[in-house]
Structures are given as C-alpha cells and as structure tokens.
C-alpha cells in the first residue's frame, strides 16, 4: 500500500478523567505516530529531570496540549498515528475544557470513539457512576452520530490481570453502553495497560486467559487481540462527495492583486474552478475563479479539505465567517427563518424555558438564538415523547425545541448535512446544552446579488 493510499479516519478518546486517556493516546502516538524521536527524547529527559518518569507518555501529550492551548500552532501531525490500514487523527481528548464544543463544531466528525475504562478497584465504579462524565461523553458521541465504539479496559496491571475482574467490568460496561445506544456485540473490548504497553500494539503475555476480542457488525465478524487491530477494524467512513456542496467559511481575506478569498473546510460535495456558488445567508452568487489548498492549485476540492478560493466581484464586506457556500444549481444553501432541534441540556444550573436566548455555535457560525417554543420532552434513549409542551427543561433533560436565530444564519437538518446540523449552546462561558437539528424553515430569499461573471457562467 502506497503512503498516499491509506484512508484517513478520525477518532475521539473518551473516559473518566483518571482513566489513563492521555497515557494510552500518548503511547499510540509515541509508538506509531508523528512525533519525531528527537522531540520524544527531549520530553523524556525533561520528564526524568522533573521526576515524572512514570508519566512519560502522558507527559508527551501534556506538552503537546500545553503548546496547543497556549496558541502555539503545534504541528498537528503530532496528534496523528498510523495503523497498517489507516492514518488516524485524534480529534480531541476530553478534559480539554472546550472538548464538548470542539466535538460539535469540531473540525470533523469522529468515525469512532475509543472509551477508556480504568480497571482499578473503585476507579471503574467512579468512572461510570450515574453522574460520571463518561456517560455524558458517550451519550454525546452517540447523539452526534458517532456509531462505532471500541472499549479499552485500561490499567489491567493494577488489577493483577485478573480475569474475573475483567469479565465483571465487561458485563457492567456492556450494560452501560447499551443504555447509551451502542450495541455491545458490535464493540471490541480490549484489556490493556496504556503505560506498560500490554495489548496496545502486540499481544500481552500477562493474560493467558485472554483469547482476543471479537465484534460482529453488518460488514461481518472481526477478531483480533490488540487495540491497534481494533482500530484497524473500524469501518471506513463514506465521505459525502456525492452530496451537494456545503462549505462553512472560517475567514474571508482580501488579497492584493487577487481579490476576495474565502477560506473554509468543505463538509460535503466538491468545489471546482468555474463553479457558480451561492453564499447564505448573505445571498450572494458568484463564480469561483480558482481553488487552492496549502498554496497549490486544485482541480477539485473534496470533503475534509481546507481550501481557499478566489471569487470575482464580491467585496470582503458582503460575505463573512459563518456564511455557507454551496452550488447555485444544486440545492443552494439558504438562511433559516427558524428550525426545530432536539436539545439536550447538560450543565445548566437553572431551568430553561421559552424565551431563553443563548449563543449557538454551529459549524463556524456563532449567533444568539431564541428558544421560541418547547414542543415536547423526550426520552434521550428511545427518542419517544414523554411530555408535550413542557414549561421548563433542566440538566439531563432532552426536548424538541423551536428556535429562532436573532440574525440570519444558515443551518441544515442533521440527516441532510450532519456538520451543519449539530450545535453547542453556550452560556456563562461553558457549553450548557447540545442540539441536533431536525428540520429547518428556510427564509424566503431577500434581494439577491448575482455578479456579472455568475450570470455569464450560468448562460454557458
């Protein structure tokens, strides 16, 4: 397999704060990843000097995190590792205070979640207790459409690799993930030590009783022994090239001698020079002159690509971050007058009722929206209504809500365009709720601007 032929997949690592997420992720990146040996040796030396030798993998990760949080643009390759089949990017490990927001507006949808559970006495119980963040993160992943899961039972060395303990944990965890919505039969359970490396890349000699993991999905039956093999058995994502174009703008630049250059990540569809695109909710239509990525011209940009594209006769004042570009001839994007969404309240101290108007983060847009009407309260797991027209909802509740944006914004139903159909509700400087959009009432188009070049291109 040539270097270029491997599929890229994204994983998100979830679990309780002390489950060993950093150590486990650090180990994978360390052994199969983009951290060059020099950096590692530097980190190891620092760790040893500070008496943190026992944390070496986590230390590597902490260094990367610290640099990333200080805004030093850290080489993102450091968060990647390679398996025989895939290039894997670790999207964001929780614990990061913006984890939830990142997971929703995040640069990408995770293809699989890796749930890390600590086997130590008391640790496991704390991790999946009722108020545990583990439950919250797992539910969040599931609600946001992450349908594949791997469970790694970590710190097996602290449980002396006892088979009985492992079986007990598997039984409990199976019930736990079933309640969240995952099917345990389709999940690989792997006993590991993220620190010592058991069953990470090579089978451990410490658990002769362990015959390997197995999972059964629509695609068939898979078996293996290590965490790496479990990651390799993730089903590859179908990238949405066949859908109409949706490209939320991250920035719009004015470049001397070239003109206006919007920049963003293609979420669905393709973008090619010569295409006529419409920006919503600005309602501007124009022709794309050129498309480039990493300073190279592209014949075609695809989902996942972060591109800049040059548009003709459009000023920087007319389009902005949060606008969405789409193909003017194929389901062009439009502003939303209102939308209904399933909203899950996560950590709001009080009650939320009609009239609440927090800020929504949806793709690159950041706009206040009013909870106009609480239509029904629903059971998070089954999606069935439990109460119609509730007066209030509080933490832990889920409801179908009609929402009205305070100013024009472009969103879509989650089933049509997932990245444009999930949002975080921010208030008091934290994520207080998350939502998945069910339906959108598009606004009747205001006066539209169509540039001359677009009109000319349309006649061709």
Curated annotation (Swiss-Prot):
Pfam family, one: GTP_EFTU
Chief site of localization: cytoplasm
N,N,N-trimethylglycine modifications at: 2
Highest taxon of source: Eukaryota
Protein localization: Cytoplasm
Modified residues annotated as N6-methyllysine in this record: 3, 317, 391
Region (G2): 71-75
Region G4, residue ranges: 154-157
Annotated InterPro entries: EFTu-like_2, G_TR_CS, GTP-eEF1A_C, P-loop_NTPase, T_Tr_GTP-bd_dom, TRAFAC_GTPase_members, Transl_B-barrel_sf, Transl_elong_EF1A/Init_IF2_C
Full protein name: Elongation factor 1-alpha
Organism: Hypocrea jecorina (Trichoderma reesei)
Lineage per the UniProt record: Eukaryota, Fungi, Dikarya, Ascomycota, Pezizomycotina
